[in-house]
Design a protein with these regions (language model features):
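Single transmembrane alpha-helix segments in multi-pass membrane proteins
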Residues: 2-3, 12-64, 97-102
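Structural signature of hydrophobic alpha-helical transmembrane segments
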Residues: 14-25, 74-85, 151, 223-226
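Hydrophobic alpha-helical segments embedded in the membrane of multi-pass proteins
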Residues: 21-32, 52, 155, 159, ...
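Alpha-helical transmembrane segments of multipass membrane proteins
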Residues: 30-34, 56-63, 91-95, 117, ...
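Mid-bilayer segments of alpha-helical transmembrane spans in multi-pass integral membrane proteins
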Residues: 56-59, 83-92, 113, 117-125
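Alpha-helical transmembrane segments within multi-pass membrane transporters and channels
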Residues: 66-112
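Helix-loop-helix "hairpin" substructures at the membrane interface of multi-pass membrane proteins
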Residues: 74-78, 88-93, 145-221
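Transmembrane helix-bundle core of multi-pass membrane transporters
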Residues: 100, 104-168, 194-197, 216-225
């Protein structure tokens, strides 16, 4: 199981495959950790948000076509649009939980059930294929690097969130609100906004995971991504 070798210039082995396939889950788990730390709740809609982000990204890249061999629009615009869409999904969840005080499980159940339908509307109910080598790098390999690219995404996400939690005021605020939201509010912290931000961040991280997942399969499949 732990044997690792290099074949065709890339690392090969069961442990590498497990870590590679778990990369999207790590990114999702980091976002859900922030949500749990701040609100004590969960976000069960992250899989659907992944599908929405993948659908938006691939639909822009394909220009509305079912399958393309070259980009019809800028990949930068596509990625930004996908992350904005996922942030909007997170903001919707955050508004329901932080502002309307709906139980997180119930609030996020809305996008859990409706999110894939939204993704299907974006792609017109079809699987959108992006057969471009540069798009495949996010879910494959960059150049001659033997380590799968998703592993780098997961590591970078872990490091950034760790630094935010341990080295910034926002991290302290999230911890304070999570421990005792009422006490945090009484000392001047905007508990509502902090909870809201954690859901937005969770949505963005789900969007990143969705882009990586779509890159793996060169397409946006709203039924299976996430």
């Amino acid at each position: 199981f732990f044997n690792v070798s290099i074949r065709n210039g890339v690392l090969y082995g069961y442990i590498i495959d497990v870590i590679n396939r778990a990369s999207e889950l790590v990114i999702l788990a980091i976002g859900m950790t922030l949500v749990t730390a701040a609100s004590g709740g969960q976000d069960i809609s992250v899989g659907a948000v992944m599908a929405v982000a993948a659908a938006v990204c691939c639909q822009i890249l394909s220009g509305g076509q079912v399958s393309v061999n070259e980009y019809q629009n800028s990949i930068i615009i596509a990625v930004i649009a996908a992350l904005l869409a996922s942030a909007l999904c997170g903001a919707f969840n955050g508004f329901l939980v932080a502002r309307l005080n709906i139980q997180p499980m119930v609030a996020t159940l809305i996008l859990y059930t409706a999110g894939r339908g939204i993704a299907q509307l974006v792609t017109n109910g079809q699987i959108t294929y992006i057969r471009v080598d540069s798009f495949k790098m996010a879910g494959g390999y960059i150049g001659k690097c033997p380590i799968p690219t998703p592993i780098f995404f997961a590591i970078i996400t872990v490091l950034i969130v760790y630094l935010i939690l341990k080295k910034t005021a926002l991290g302290l605020y999230i911890e304070s609100v999570g421990i005792n939201g009422k006490a945090a509010r009484l000392v001047g912290l905007n508990s509502t906004m902090i909870k809201f931000l954690t859901y937005v961040i969770c949505g963005v991280l789900a969007g990143i995971a969705g882009i990586v997942a779509s890159s793996r399969i060169y397409s946006a499949d709203a039924n299976n991504i996430g």
